[in-house]
């Protein structure tokens, strides 16, 4: 096994200019991630300099068997924390051979919104809090829970330490460091309210880069849990009952919100979000109705409510933002399995482009 580990960690840059590029894309479910690798003649830092590639879309639920070729367009480059050296991870989106985005390509429409001059001028910042649950591989039950049983009630686990309260920290810390190495603007991690559940935060990142970074951070997490023999779940309510669900709270601000008088701009933006509540909920993740119950630090899915420091609201404004009269707000509605391309671009569209 030591020889295998040595070969896995072999630094090919010692005797070759060639690099390995891992092309990554979102699969047919809209949540599964797929990837495959190719050799390139030398280091690349600009995604536009990377070749397009293709894959069998009939094997990912993204194309019929009789016309199965789907084309990958490289969009963002990150350093590869697994192969290291000059090797890279490449976030791609997917198109038909005719150049049309396939239905599961949510990046294309998001990029159009973020390319709008009115959106560019406002330099939208996002900070996304990605929650997830670690599961024991063969029993599909949270890490640290007795098989077929339950731990003690919630309370001791949030931001906890100790072998009886904190489960999976080695995975979490490995993911944290690997994400930093990759160039993701990961800003922190913490243990969550339900045992076996964790969170990492990405941002503040500008525009579509926030969504690219979340997808690559998810990819890195899936790869690390694969190595550890643990399953990661982004289900918004993995365990029914008196247990917290998993969300992807999305913090948002624009240039106008960050400047003097920004609090008034924030309130107008929140008013717009309230008017489109149903549209946003329908795009904020599968199974979110199991999570947004009005309990466990959530608002009811059918009710739009905002407030200062209120974690039972749809939109929360921080005390600092209220006090300073400028800043950001937090959309607490997105589920942990949301598509960040959809959520970030929809918030920008509603607050900056949509006129009631």
UniProtKB/Swiss-Prot annotation:
Residues 106-356 form the GS catalytic domain. Keywords: Acetylation, ATP-binding, Cytoplasm, Ligase, Nitrogen fixation, Nucleotide-binding, Phosphoprotein. Expressed in the pericycle of all root tissues. Residues 19-99 form the GS beta-grasp domain. The modification N-acetylserine is found at residue 2. It catalyses: L-glutamate + NH4(+) + ATP = L-glutamine + ADP + phosphate + H(+). Pfam families: Gln-synt_C, Gln-synt_N. This is Glutamine synthetase cytosolic isozyme 1-2. It comes from Arabidopsis thaliana.
């Amino acid at each position: 096994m030591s020889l295998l580990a040595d070969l896995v960690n072999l630094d090919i840059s010692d005797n070759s200019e060639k690099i390995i590029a891992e092309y990554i894309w979102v699969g047919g479910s809209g949540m599964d991630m797929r990837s495959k690798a190719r050799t390139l003649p030398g280091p690349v830092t600009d995604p536009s300099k990377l070749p397009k590639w293709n894959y069998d879309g009939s094997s990912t639920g993204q194309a019929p068997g009789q016309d199965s070729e789907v084309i990958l367009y490289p969009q963002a480059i990150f350093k590869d924390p697994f192969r290291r050296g000059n090797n890279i991870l490449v976030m791609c989106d997917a198109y038909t051979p005719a150049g049309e985005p396939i239905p599961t390509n949510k990046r294309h429409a998001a990029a159009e919104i973020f390319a709008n001059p009115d959106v560019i001028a406002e330099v939208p910042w996002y900070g996304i809090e990605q929650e997830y649950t670690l599961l024991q591989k063969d029993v599909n039950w949270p890490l640290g829970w007795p098989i077929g049983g339950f731990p003690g009630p919630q309370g001791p686990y949030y931001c906890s330490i100790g072998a009886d309260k904190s489960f999976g920290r080695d995975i979490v810390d490995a993911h944290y460091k690997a994400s930093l190495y990759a160039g993701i603007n990961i800003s922190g991690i913490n243990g969550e309210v339900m045992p076996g559940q964790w969170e990492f935060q990405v941002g503040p990142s500008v525009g579509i880069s926030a969504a690219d970074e979340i997808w690559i951070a998810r990819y890195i997490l899936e790869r690390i849990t694969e190595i550890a023999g643990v399953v990661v779940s982004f289900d918004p309510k993995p365990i029914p009952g008196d247990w917290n669900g998993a969300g992807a709270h999305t913090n948002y601000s624009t240039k106008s919100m960050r400047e003097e008088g920004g609090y008034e701009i924030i309130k107008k933006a929140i008013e717009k979000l309230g008017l489109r509540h149903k549209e946003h909920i329908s795009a904020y993740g599968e199974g979110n109705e199991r999570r947004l119950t009005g309990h466990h630090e959530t608002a009811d899915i059918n009710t739009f409510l905002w407030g200062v420091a209120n974690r039972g609201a749809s939109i929360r404004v921080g005390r600092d933002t209220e006090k300073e009269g400028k800043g950001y707000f937090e959309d607490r509605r997105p589920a942990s399995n949301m598509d960040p391309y959809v959520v970030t671009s929809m918030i920008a569209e509603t607050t900056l482009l949509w006129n009631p």
